[in-house]
Amino acid sequence: MGSCLSSDLPPRAGAGAGASPGWPQRWRRRRQRGVERGGAVSGGGGGVFSIGVGGKKLHHGGGGGGEMTEEELAKVEGRVCVNGASAAACLHTQQGRKGTNQDAMVVWENFNTSDSVFCGVFDGHGPYGHFVAKKVRDSLPVKIRTLWKTSANEDTSSHQNGSISGSVNSEESPVVDDEWGEYADDSEKLPEMFLPLKQSYFKAFKLMDKELKMHPTVDCFCSGSTAVTLVKQGLDLVVGNLGDSRAIMGTRDAANNLTAVQLTVDLKPNLPREAARIQQCRGRVFALQDEPEVARVWLPNNDSPGLAMARAFGDFCLKDYGLISVPQISYRRLTEKDEFIILATDGVWDVLSNKEAVDIVAAAPSRATAARALVDCAVRSWRLKFPTSKSDDCAVVCLFLDHAKSPDLIQENESEEETTEDVAIPDTVAKVDQDIAQGDAHISSEEQITEPALQHSYTLRDVDEIVPVEEPPVSKEPERCGSARSLADCISTNEEEEWSALEGVTRVNSLLNLPRILSGEKRSTSWRKRR
């Protein structure tokens, strides 16, 4: 996600310097006042922000002053943010066919204690969404960790000061309240760690968005990022979600069948509560005629930018009109039936159902390759289901849960899996291949051309489909497309091969166009004219 239909902007070196001269004067004055107050300090282009609480720098748990730089983060044991695997998780990302890969991901073991782990997936959008996603990936976990350590050792009231008191996101939206950020099963008995961690999440997300707003080298006016994150400590699982990336869990039911449980809600503008908040702040929510299933957020008096999510970091052109950066926090007590958790961007969920994703991870030859197997299947599904569309970026984190298994048994099972020569293909993926091979080979090229490429959106659901956390047991049959290519053909296709989707249309985009007039002020120069 992250392609902008109205602008193909080359990324500027170091993301440029200073605010764009085309920004509205009000935006530039507000940002300049924040910098003069000492609210933010540049991280030197690729570094990590160093804004703190009450103008003071946050200190990470390692004892050093300020926040951690990229060099310091790279030395943290148990932290992985590139394709690979750790002791408990694996992660993989692949660039789509829309341009720069705007997805980012991270796994951080021994996060706060020896039995805690942090996982996150971030999907950038807009001209500089890749910068925003990477900044959030590097800075947000440090903030959560720092605030969590502090709140666990001191009374919560001692941390309430001018920069974090009151509403979680009162500067961006007057209607934001705790009700926008938390949901949990009433039957769940919340542990002691939940309240401090929940408060740390809210504060960290607010500080993260404030840094992006005032950062002098990252243009976030029409660029932003989603964030789906989790913190697991022992058997306690806390999930924080912002945007339309998704977290699901593979667990066993009463009959010992592997099922998929959705842990987050896709926070899109078609949800009644999200739409009501946006409209209360004078923002508009509607879908275009050529994609009636995709609700978008628009400015009050301008048909831009058309953001396809209701919450996000950045996108400050919409922060006065209902877009918020308050995460939705949920808690779950893990059981021995829970096997793994999948965090992924919408590039995966656009083409695969929750059950399909769970089956693919369960059938992976080894834990270290599970995330890559899911990304590969998503890429192949894009080519099979939407041959005239450009595939989206895909990023996946798989966290494996071991409750009753010993480390020796885990290592033994992984060794056996790695020696397996044949990779098992889940029934759901095999079914797609079978349908295409048997039923679609006779479709003529003329019929293929007339089939609409923007017919379905698998990320966006109706209200009745989104709100339940657990997915219905009966999965929807995958839609057929006009392609006669088999799954084996797609597997053997080289990544460098120019396939037909390169010349096709781009499916559902996060951002449609950039605003040209804001608050009655004309942009002095074009968005493209940057130095």
Curated annotation (Swiss-Prot):
EC number(s) on file: 3.1.3.16
Alphabetic keyword roster: Hydrolase, Magnesium, Manganese, Metal-binding, Protein phosphatase
Cofactor(s) annotated in UniProt: Mg(2+); Mn(2+)
Record-level Gene Ontology MF annotations: metal ion binding; protein serine/threonine phosphatase activity
Sites where the protein binds Mn(2+) 1: D123, G124
Domain PPM-type phosphatase: 88-401
Region Disordered: start-end pairs: 1-47, 151-176
One Pfam family recorded for the sequence: PP2C
Top-rank lineage group of the source organism: Eukaryota
Compositional bias (Low complexity): 10-25
Swiss-Prot/TrEMBL GO biological process terms: regulation of intracellular signal transduction
Composition bias, Polar residues: 151-172
Residues holding Mn(2+) 2: D123, D346, D392
InterPro entries reported in the protein's UniProt record: PP2C, PPM-type-like_dom_sf, PPM-type_phosphatase-like_dom
Catalysed conversion reaction: O-phospho-L-seryl-[protein] + H2O = L-seryl-[protein] + phosphate; O-phospho-L-threonyl-[protein] + H2O = L-threonyl-[protein] + phosphate
Cofactor descriptive note: Binds 2 magnesium or manganese ions per subunit.
Keyword Manganese: yes
PANTHER family, per database record: PROTEIN PHOSPHATASE (PTHR47992)
Family: Belongs to the PP2C family.
Name the UniProt record assigns to this protein: Probable protein phosphatase 2C 66
Organism: Oryza sativa subsp. japonica
